[in-house]
Structure formats: structure tokens, C-alpha cells
Amino acid sequence: LPAFAGHVPRELSRIFPKAKITRLEAWSGYPDEYACSFLDPMDSLFTVVQKKFIETETKLYGTDHVYGIDLFNELMPPSWEPEYLGRVSRQVYEALEKADKDAVWLQMTWLFWNERKYWTNDRVKPYITSFPADRQLLLDYYCERQEVWQRTNKYFGVPYIWCYLGNFGGNTMLVGDVKNVNKLLENTFKNGGKNFTGIGSTLEGFDCNPFMYSYVFEKAWDFKTHRDIPAWTRALADQRTGKADQN
């Protein structure tokens, strides 16, 4: 389930004038008038909103206790001080825990790659290690091109999922390097650390390039068998079109 990530309309400051609300930089070159406002997690109002948000959606949908929160995805935080980043993430988790004692915080790590100039390890580490590792799960978002676990000391022991993206913004295309994906997965199983938790996909659109997604997920279920890529390809063709005719 999604949870409250602190992004609020700027008009909220009229209702709560004492709340610590910061104006973040505009996203992706948009004019500043469209920039996002951010309710500081250290403000007590953040916990109030989070609790109400989770209570409401749990009544509607139930819960598996896993909550997606991406605070600064493609956004600059109010401060790059490591101490601040650590305090922010710790407070976000504590607000989650007050709303659901079994809460697990799920977040993608695309920000660590997309803003890699700023997300150095001295900032990444406090951001993801300031609360219990077993209460969070990271999605290594774009592993076929950039495995962030390799840049961040295996996420300093925090559980993560190796994810195949393969699709930005719902683009339709038939493309993918199966051999390289297999190589990367084999290496992750061997060297990714005990906190490597599973294989997933972060595709941004459905019904495109089923070949690659079939391979990734079949690899997850039957890891050793799918090392023979030509054999897997022939089997997939048989499943889709029937057996090849000897003639």
C-alpha cells in the first residue's frame, strides 16, 4: 500500500501555519509554481497525517503491512547533511510504526542512481540504516543497467530486491539482453550478500516485451535450469507456437 510521504499542497500552511513545510525544487525542469511542498517528518503533524492515512486505507483495502514511501525520488531533499537524512528516515519509520506496529517500509533506490552526484555513500548509509534493517525493503530499480547494490556496499546490510525495469513510461519495445541479465543475476546470487532478498520487476507499463519478463521471472522460480538460454528460448517458442515441424 502507499503511505504518506510528506508531499502536500502548499495551501496546507494556511490551515497549519506553525507546521514545518518546505518548498522543494521543481521536478524535471517544471516552473517553480508547480514545485512540491514537503511536510517535515520531524513535525508532529506528519505523524498525525500518516496515522490517519493508513487507518483510512486499511479500512478500505486491508493491509499486508508493507508500505511504499519514496520521499525524495527525483527531488532534492531540504538538506544534504547526513545527520538530517538519518533523522528524516528514522522519523518516517517511527510514524509508520505508530500507525501499524508491523509496518515495513518499501522504497525504490532509483534516487541513489539518478542523483548519484549527491547520494554519496556517506549520505546513503544514514538514510537507510537509521532504523531496523528488518523493517524495510529496497527495490534496486534498474539492475539490467545499473545495480545500485554494487555502488552502496550492498546497501549496508539492508534487504533488497534485484529488479528488472525494461520499460520507462509505458514505452512499447521488443528489446533486451538476456545473456547479460542472466550474467548479472548469477553474479548477484553469488556476491550480492545475505540481504539480497529476491528478484522483481519495476516495469513502468504492462503488455510489452513479454519475452524478457518471462525470462526474469522463470529464472527466479527455477534458477539453475535457466542458465541454458538457447534451450529456454526454444522452449518458449514451443509454448507460444507449438512444436517445430521436422520438415
Language-model region placement:
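Catalytic-core regions of glycoside hydrolase
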Residues: 1-246
